[in-house]
Regions:
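Preference for solvent-exposed, low-hydrophobicity sequence contexts
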Residues: 70-292, 296, 376, 388
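Short loop/turn segments that connect beta-strands within beta-propeller blades
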Residues: 33-37, 88, 259-261, 314-318, ...
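Residue-level signature of beta-propeller blades and closely related beta-rich strand-turn architectures
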Residues: 24, 36, 78-80, 125-126, ...
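Structural WD40 beta-propeller signal
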Residues: 60-67, 114, 294-297, 335-340, ...
Length: 399
């Protein structure tokens, strides 16, 4: 259990370690665990000159964003900003409004910067995209109504060209999709379509094999959104990682797995795959789940209730929950699999858990390769002394 605290990170140590986004009485604080020293450093943005930001959402490492000097995005209710790769230093030009057409002051809650051609985000119910063809384009609006949940489904495995993104309209209660390059191909004047429309465009452009899978026949409508997550998990080994979405219909909970490809077939064998369907309603206390996480190693889903983590084997029907671990006296505030960006890593499969007890945050990392996704007997690496952890990302080595 490591809880040493220092306020400032020595520059030489900044090249690798965990970045922990904390909510401290509603204020944003960024803490770090150095993988070099094993020590923790609190409030590392305090002396950077960055204005105080309220209600943190996400901390992202985005080496493919197009901003090589500042590959970190900090997302908060007060807006978003990039951070310098070497010192986390802040400049006014890092403020997200300078990346948006007309310098509109957006407040993105989610962002995907994996694709070679586009960056996308959702802010206040609308999706925005920026094209990266030669020069860094500005973000423009994809849909007019503020109806979208702050999650984006995307293929994180393939190096796609004309990516298709998955969205959920929580007003009209249906999946939607966006392909920013549709107008460039002359396939549609709009980038934003229903799933059935996007399927029809893909089939008309490249043939019937552009849509595959029979896990479900029709896309669901009328259900409430619960959660969405992108994974590297692909049962067909075709660079088509599954995006999972949890939906609720009254007291019933359902899971849909959708594979998202490329309209141009660049690096992807098809455009859309209906990969998975399951009924989660029989899983213990699923209606009380506060956090979800999906493995990229095995077909497993994890969810947290209070301080307890359950695992669901998605390959076994009917779906049922198996208790994995209990953090007595603690409340789990964040749970994820950190998907590494600089290359394949076995640590993609490590379960990362943030918890809180009396205002003190603790980070635990459970090695995913010891029991291949069964964490019940895995002893975690533990760090404590943080604020309430709302997100974490691993700061990988950078040049």
């Amino acid at each position: 259990l490591m809880c040493c605290k220092f306020n400032k990170v020595p520059p030489i140590l900044r090249n690798e370690g965990w970045l922990l986004l904390c909510d401290v009485n509603g204020k944003t604080r960024l803490d770090m665990v150095s993988n070099i020293t094993g020590q923790t450093y609190l409030d590392i943005l305090k002396s950077t000159g960055m204005p105080e930001l309220n209600h943190p959402y996400r901390i992202l490492y985005t080496p493919n964003s197009g901003y090589s000097d500042s590959p970190f995005y900090l997302l908060t209710a007060d807006g978003a900003t990039r951070l310098n790769k070497n010192s986390f230093a802040w400049k006014e030009e890092y403020a997200f409004k300078y990346e948006v057409a007309k310098q509109t002051d957006l407040h993105p809650q989610s962002m995907i910067c994996h694709n070679a051609m586009t960056n996308v985000c959702v802010s206040d119910g609308r999706m925005y995209y920026a094209l990266k063809s030669g020069i860094q384009g500005l973000y423009t609006e994809a849909n007019k109504q503020s109806v979208l949940v702050p999650y984006i489904g995307s293929n994180l495995v393939a190096s796609a060209f004309a990516s298709i993104y998955l969205l959920y309209d929580d007003v009209n209660k249906c999946f939607m999709s966006c392909c920013p390059l549709l107008p460039a191909f002359g396939l549609s004047n709009d980038t934003y379509h229903t799933m059935k429309e996007m399927e029809a465009i893909a089939v008309g452009f490249q043939g019937s094999d552009m849509v595959t899978g029979d896990a479900f026949s029709e896309y669901p409508t009328g259900m409430d959104f619960v959660y969405m997550e992108n994974t590297y998990y692909d049962p067909g080994n075709a660079d088509m990682g599954v995006t999972y979405t949890v939906l609720r219909d009254g007291q019933k909970y359902y899971l849909y797995g959708i594979q998202l490809g490329d309209m141009y077939k660049s690096g992807c064998p098809y455009a859309i795959g209906k990969a998975y369907y399951g009924d989660l309603s029989g899983c213990k206390d699923i209606n009380k789940a506060s956090c979800y996480a999906f493995s990229s190693l095995r077909n497993y889903m994890y969810y947290a209730v209070g301080g307890i983590v359950y695992r669901v084997n998605l390959s076994e029907k009917p779906l049922k929950a198996e208790k994995q671990l209990a953090l007595n006296g603690e409340t789990i505030t964040m749970m994820k699999f950190n998907l590494y960006q600089n290359g394949a890593s076995q640590h993609d499969y490590d379960l990362v858990v943030g918890s809180e007890n009396n205002g003190v945050g603790t980070l635990r990392i459970y090695d995913g390769m010891v029991k291949e996704g069964d964490f019940a007997t895995v002893k975690p690496t533990t760090y404590t002394g943080f604020g309430k952890i709302v997100d974490a990302t691993y700061r990988e080595r950078t040049n």
